[in-house]
């Protein structure tokens, strides 16, 4: 499960059982995120959480990291048997927006920030899976 953590809302993405294709799952209001993840994990198999690392171009942490790090700590404590992979999330929102344009979504649909968060999480998860799969080939 990929988590594009945001202060207000968080995009989530998951993969198929053989880990080939990442798919947008939903956008959750961040205050409800932890409850949503616990309920999801109770009914679906999740062995890895992929969480973005928010950095500036000079590799320094962005302001978002002050919110992301406490969440990652909470996730680690609640799910000690699950892997937490950290990935660079720079440009994922821009890539998500471009994906929406390329797919022909109307301007009104592209303004839906929740969709951008879901697509950004999907991009993070697909990149992570591509990296893992290339490592094992």
Segments and roles (model prediction):
Residues 3, 7-8, 13-137:
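Phosphate- and other anionic-substrate recognition elements at nucleic-acid/protein interfaces
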């Amino acid at each position: 499960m990929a988590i594009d953590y945001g202060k207000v809302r968080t995009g989530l993405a998951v993969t198929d059982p053989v880990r080939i294709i990442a798919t947008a799952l939903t956008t959750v209001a961040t205050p409800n995120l932890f409850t949503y993840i616990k309920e999801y994990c109770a009914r679906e198999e999740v062995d890895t959480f992929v969480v973005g690392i928010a950095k500036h171009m000079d590799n320094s942490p962005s302001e978002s990291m002050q919110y992301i790090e406490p969440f990652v700590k909470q996730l680690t404590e609640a799910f000690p048997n699950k892997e937490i992979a950290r990935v660079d999330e720079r440009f994922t929102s821009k890539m998500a927006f471009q994906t929406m344009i390329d797919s022909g979504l109307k301007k009104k649909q592209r303004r839906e920030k929740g969709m951008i968060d879901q697509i950004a999480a999907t991009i993070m998860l697909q990149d992570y899976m591509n990296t893992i799969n290339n490592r094992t080939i």
